[in-house]
């Protein structure tokens, strides 16, 4: 069960520290408590209320069997997001956002399918029938795909929502989500426009301690939602469709992988 949100815990994590006042976005005014030494201080009571609101929505999404894609490519957030999202069994992008990740999902699916094909080759023994050089090349290709696509190898369809750390840094991802009417949950600092996302969590999005605290709270809610999952039907159907796709032209897929791997640069 997710922990109760305590304002003192948010305070200890430094969630309240905003940016310098001259960098503020006036649309964040409702979430700002005061100014101190030229820095805006976020109202943590409002932050706590917004986390509660976001968590209720995230729980429902998780309980329905749909995916929430976590996006954070800034240095201080990457490792935290990878760890927390993986613990909640949710996909994440922590390297450069692949352009068209959402709006051109068919192409992304092809890359994801390559990852799945390589994983299957390793599982069924096909990988070991390759020459040593080919195995090295295929491993290199798999590593490249993993780096570019994060943990989305099991994401067979568009996510139901995005969770973003720093909406300025991830503006391309947010624009793609907007085009497809995919709701965005986000940590929003005092220098950003909260109108760009559906679920605003006013918070310090620069300090790792603050990011860790918020991510812990939201992923606990997601894990709760998964535990109370109400319907597996949709997810099961998707799994069957993907499984059916994978057995189609298996040998051709494997040959294509080996050929592409041979062209991959070190």
From Swiss-Prot:
Stretches for region Disordered: 229-254
Keywords: Ribonucleoprotein, Ribosomal protein
UniProt cross-references to InterPro entries, sorted A to Z: Ribosomal_uS2, Ribosomal_uS2_bac/mit/plastid, Ribosomal_uS2_CS, Ribosomal_uS2_flav_dom_sf
GO cellular component terms listed in the entry, alphabetical order: cytosolic small ribosomal subunit
Pfam families for the chain: Ribosomal_S2 (PF00318)
Gene Ontology biological process terms, A to Z: translation
GO molecular function: structural constituent of ribosome
Residue spans of biased composition, Acidic residues class: 237-247
Protein family according to the UniProt entry: Belongs to the universal ribosomal protein uS2 family.
Name of the protein in question: Small ribosomal subunit protein uS2
Organism whose genome encodes this protein: Flavobacterium psychrophilum (strain ATCC 49511 / DSM 21280 / CIP 103535 / JIP02/86)
């Amino acid at each position: 069960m997710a922990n109760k949100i305590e304002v003192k815990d948010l305070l200890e994590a430094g969630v309240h520290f905003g940016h310098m006042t001259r960098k503020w976005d006036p649309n964040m005014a409702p979430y700002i408590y005061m100014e101190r030494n030229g820095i805006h201080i976020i109202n943590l009571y409002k932050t706590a209320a917004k986390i509660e609101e976001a968590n209720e929505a995230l729980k429902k999404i998780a309980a329905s069997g749909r995916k929430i894609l976590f996006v954070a490519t800034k240095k201080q957030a990457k490792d935290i997001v990878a760890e927390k999202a993986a613990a909640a069994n949710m996909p994440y992008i922590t390297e450069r956002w692949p352009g068209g990740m959402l709006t051109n999902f068919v192409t992304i699916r092809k890359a994801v399918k390559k990852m799945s094909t390589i994983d299957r080759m390793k599982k069924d023994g096909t990988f070991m029938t390759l020459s040593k050089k080919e195995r090295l090349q295929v491993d290199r290709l798999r590593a490249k795909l993993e780096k570019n696509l994060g943990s989305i190898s099991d994401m067979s369809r568009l996510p139901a929502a995005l969770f973003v750390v720093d909406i300025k840094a991830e503006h391309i991802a947010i624009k793609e989500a907007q085009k497809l009417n995919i709701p965005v949950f986000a940590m929003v600092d005092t220098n950003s426009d909260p109108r760009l996302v559906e679920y605003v969590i006013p918070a310090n999005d620069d300090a790792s301690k603050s990011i860790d605290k918020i991510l812990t709270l939201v992923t606990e809610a997601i894990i709760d939602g998964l535990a109370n999952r109400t319907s597996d039907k949709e997810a099961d159907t998707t799994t069957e469709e993907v499984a059916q796709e994978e057995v189609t032209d298996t040998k051709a897929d494997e040959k294509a992988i080996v050929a592409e791997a041979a062209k991959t640069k070190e």
